[in-house]
Amino acid sequence: LKRVKNRSKQLLTLTEKTSKMKKIKNLALLMAIVLGLTFTSCTKDNTATIEEEETAVAPVGIPQDVFEKAQSLHFNTFDMQKTMFEKPGGKMEEAYLLEGDIMIPHDQLMAMEFGDGITSKQYRTSNLVSDGVITIIGYTANNSNGLTTKMQTGLQWAVDNYNALGLDISFQLTFGTNYQNKDMVVYQVSGGAGGSAGFPSGGNPNKWVRINSGLAPYSNNVHEHVIGHEIGHSIGFRHSDYFSRQSCGQNSNEGSAGVGAIHIPGTPTGWDPTSLMNACFSSSEDGEFNSNDITALRWMY
């Protein structure tokens, strides 16, 4: 009987030990699960934080969906601005100013798809203008949109520069107010020294070329330079220094602008300080193409 009792005690002790061990194992397993859940939760939180940090917030006044659309098209949105796009006669339309002188109406921007674009002079866009004659008019109405005498001279000189190269495109220039059926319209708007234009699409050049009233104090050569530059955008050229904007004293890449930034063979990949298509200009510009500009134009057209 004693032996049986002792055996029972031994069995009981063994059972208790086994039970305790199971409890310890279960507790350890539970702790491991809790720690695992805690670690997983932290990881998810960290991932969410990173994703939130990578989602840029639109500048004040620009809808988030519009801002994200511009980014998806690889525009440089650093100085993106919402503004009003003025047409001859004073009609206003909502637009966005990108990269200093690229003006795109709201509807056009939202309809753009990647690959719809342009290039710079020595970097071009993926969309070009169809070969042939481009009709261009200098708007001369007696109102705030009419070109000044200097602007008219600059436009004439700029068009002459393009036509002198014997390209597959040419410009037929007139002056007047009947612009509706013209391919391109060059007119004046209020603003600081400079101008703005858009990119070609569907084989057609950008139609609206705006020259700012703030250009008035500058020479005819500077007018020629600015107008020639904006015409360049309108037929498919990006800024020669799109990758750095060095001409503006900056160091920021404009992106591929939804129309590509395709390097043109035979032209520099680096800084070309005398190119007509640099992002910014000086008061000493002569308005002429340099040799790299000409190489780029002849390669494209």
Describe these PLM feature segments.
Residues 147-172:
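Zn2+-dependent metallopeptidase catalytic core
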Residues 286-301:
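Short, low-complexity, Pro/Ser/Thr/Gly-rich segments in the mature regions of secreted, periplasmic
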Residues 211-227:
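Short pre-active-site segment immediately N-terminal to the catalytic Zn-binding motif
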Residues 3, 10, 15-70:
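Bacterial Sec-dependent N-terminal signal peptides
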Residues 165-179, 241-246:
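Surface-exposed patches in mature extracellular/periplasmic domains of secreted proteins
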Residues 47-147, 260-265:
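Disordered inhibitory propeptide/activation segment of secreted metzincin zinc metalloprotease zymogens
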Residues 221, 228-289:
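The catalytic-center signature of Zn2+-dependent metalloproteases
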Residues 151, 179-208, 218:
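Catalytic zinc-binding patch centered on the HExxH motif and its immediate surroundings
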